[in-house]
Regions:
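SDR active-site strand-loop-helix element
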Residues: 9, 34, 59-63, 100-105, ...
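N-terminal Rossmann NAD(P)H-binding glycine-rich loop of SDR-like oxidoreductase domains
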Residues: 4-24
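NAD(P)H-binding glycine-rich loop region in Rossmannoid oxidoreductase-like domains
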Residues: 44-81
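NAD(P)-dependent short-chain dehydrogenase/reductase
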Residues: 138-185, 190-192, 198-199, 227
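Rossmann-fold cofactor-recognition segment
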Residues: 32-45
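Catalytic helix-loop patch of NAD(P)-dependent Rossmann-fold dehydrogenases
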Residues: 80, 84-88, 108-150, 154-155
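NAD(P)-cofactor binding segment of oxidoreductase domains
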Residues: 73-101
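Mid/C-terminal beta-alpha module of Rossmann-like enzyme folds, strongest
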Residues: 14, 196, 203-227
Length: 227
C-alpha cells in the first residue's frame, strides 16, 4: 500500500476545488487537501511538521495572494504568501526527496508583448503581485531541485491588461458580472489546468518552468516527450 501522498494547498480556491473534483478520478494517490485552517503555509515549522507527519511525496501549491489590485496595499502579506511560503513548501518537499508543483502567473511579465510568452523569455513584472510570484518561483526552484513551475494566464489573458479595471467597473452591475464569467467558463479553464497537473502527477514531475494558457500548452508537448 505505498500510494504516493499528495498535498494540495489552497484547496478551497478555484484551482484547489478543481483538483479536489479530479482527485475522485485519480484514486491511485492519497490526497491531503488543506486551506489556511488546516495548514498555514506561511508558518515554516507547521509546513515541515505536516509534510513529515503525513510523509508527503508531492506538494501542489494552489495557494496564493491573488487580489492583484489589493496587492499594492498589502505588500507584506502578498510577499509572505507568494514568495516566502513557496520556499517553505519547497524546503519541506526536498526534505522528503519529493517534488513541488508551484502554480505561477503570466504577471511575471509586464504584458507589453502581444505574442504568447515563452518559458525562456526574461520576466519583467510591473506589479507587486507579479514581483512576489516571480520571487516565489525563484525561491521554490532554489530550495527544491524537483520543482515544476506552471505559469498560467489565469483570467488575465482573457481580459487583456485591464482585467482589474474591468472588474471594478462591472462590480457595480452584478448580473453583468455573472454573464461575463459564464461566457468565459472560468471553471472549465481551472479544470484544464488541474487536468494538466494530474498529467504531471501521473507521468512524473519534470522540473523546470512551463507555460499553460487557454490556447493550450506551449511546452506540454515537450514535457510529455521528456518523460
Amino acid at each position: 500500500q505505498n500510494m504516493k501522498k499528495i498535498l494540495v494547498t489552497g484547496a478551497n480556491g478555484q484551482l484547489g476545488n478543481e483538483m479536489r473534483l479530479l482527485a475522485e478520478e485519480h484514486r491511485n494517490f492519497e490526497y491531503f487537501f488543506t486551506d489556511v485552517a488546516e495548514l498555514d503555509i506561511c508558518d515554516e515549522q507547521a509546513v515541515m511538521e505536516f509534510v513529515s507527519a503525513h510523509q508527503i511525496d508531492v506538494i501542489v501549491n494552489c495557494a496564493a495572494y491573488t487580489a492583484v489590485d489589493k496587492a499594492e496595499d498589502n505588500v507584506e502579506l502578498c510577499d509572505k504568501l507568494n514568495h516566502v511560503a513557496p520556499g517553505y513548501l519547497a524546503k519541506a518537499a526536498r526534505s522528503r526527496n519529493g517534488c513541488l508543483v508551484q502554480v505561477s502567473t503570466d504577471y511575471v511579465f509586464d504584458g507589453t508583448a502581444h505574442i504568447p510568452y515563452k518559458e525562456e523569455d526574461t520576466p519583467c513584472p510591473n506589479s507587486v503581485y507579479g514581483s512576489t510570484k516571480l520571487a516565489g518561483e525563484q525561491e521554490a526552484l532554489k530550495q527544491c531541485p524537483n520543482t515544476m513551475v506552471i505559469r498560467t494566464a489565469w483570467l488575465y489573458s482573457t481580459f487583456g491588461n485591464n482585467f482589474v479595471k474591468t472588474m471594478i467597473r462591472l462590480g457595480q452591475e452584478k448580473e453583468t458580472l455573472g454573464v461575463i464569467f459564464d461566457q468565459i467558463g472560468t471553471p472549465t479553464y481551472a479544470r484544464d489546468l488541474a487536468q494538466a497537473i494530474f498529467v504531471a502527477l501521473e507521468k512524473g514531475i519534470v522540473p523546470g518552468i512551463y507555460h499553460f494558457s487557454n490556447e493550450g500548452v506551449c511546452s506540454w508537448y515537450d514535457f510529455t516527450k521528456a518523460i
